[in-house]
Amino acid sequence: MPLSDFHVSEPFTLGIELEMQVVNPPGYDLSQDSSMLIDAVKNEITAGEVKHDITESMLELATDVCRDINQAAGQFSAMQKVVLQAAADHHLEICGGGTHPFQKWQRQEVCDNERYQRTLENFGYPIQQATVFGQHVHVGCASGDDAIYLLHGLSRFVPHFIALSAASPYMQGTDTRFASSRPNIFSAFPDNGPMPWVSNWQQFEALFRCLSYTTMIDSIKDLHWDIRPSPHFGTVEVRVMDTPLTLSHAVNMAGLIQATAHWLLTERPFKHQEKDYLLYKFNRFQACRYGLEGVITDPYTGDRRPLTEDTLRLLEKIAPSAHKIAASSAIEALHRQVVSGLNEAQLMRDFVADGGSLIGLVKKHCEIWAGD
């Protein structure tokens, strides 16, 4: 399928997607019932969309195009209420978190969807292993060239986005020792990590043509890059965050990305170069492994900086932009999180260290999501 033209969007408009876990009490393993829930709510959702993701244990909540995080929060709140009621009616529960702590990937059923079934045929078992749960944030752009500039700018802060949202320390019943283990699942895919270097939209079109020759790439949706342009929507989509445990934290993460995008496109603080990506995977690893306790390295100077320190610096830089787009509350909340040193991955480990079971952990996550 040829690449569509870049659809012109109103700059800095927002779209958010949350991949939620559908679980089956009292054992709190993943259920295979997302299709049933989607059918139950389809006539009750007035804004946004509730839809499938790769496997039947995943439920995606997606906003419409929103002008700011307050509008997005309102849409999510309404969807959350409808979905929670439908889940209760079917004796199911819903929670966040980047991974389910003890599910077995072999049990996961790929949705009866042509694209997902084709992807399963192409990639095999990694598709079932990709039963992990992330938050994606779209930011509107006025042109394809703006989208490429924004993508490169946001890529500098991928470690910060991962560290702030880290919520997947457990996988397959084991403490992975990672704050965010979810991104590791995608390492088997040939397009894992950053987008190959291009400097403008024309070069991106040539890149996509080259990728399509493999016959494995039919559309942008078949690419698993950390950040990707979405020409059909006229956006740049950031895909590196774990799904948070609370709706409020998800909204704050979206506000962070929207404010960072506003700062990048209005100030143009960087002249992007291919060398910017030289240590990308090393810095990304630090964030996944250690969260905000990680250390990032400048590819030009070799200077090493604590992620905590660099994240506080980013929040300070984007504060004026956040004020202009009504996202100051998000930046202030994230600032408090960084200063406190708390993150969701550590809270999960603390629960288990205090004697909680992994079953109890999922139960607690369901209570947190329903109570937010």
Curated annotation (Swiss-Prot):
SUPFAM superfamilies: Glutamine synthetase/guanido kinase
Pfam families (alphabetical): GCS2
GO biological process: modified amino acid biosynthetic process
Alphabetical UniProt keywords: ATP-binding, Ligase, Nucleotide-binding
Coiled-coil residues: none
Reactions that this protein is recorded to catalyse: L-cysteine + L-glutamate + ATP = gamma-L-glutamyl-L-cysteine + ADP + phosphate + H(+)
EC number(s) on file: 6.3.2.2
Record-level Gene Ontology MF annotations: ATP binding; glutamate-cysteine ligase activity
Subunit and interaction comment: Homodimer.
Family membership noted in the UniProt record: Belongs to the glutamate--cysteine ligase type 2 family. YbdK subfamily.
Job description of the protein: ATP-dependent carboxylate-amine ligase which exhibits weak glutamate--cysteine ligase activity.
Protein name: Putative glutamate--cysteine ligase 2
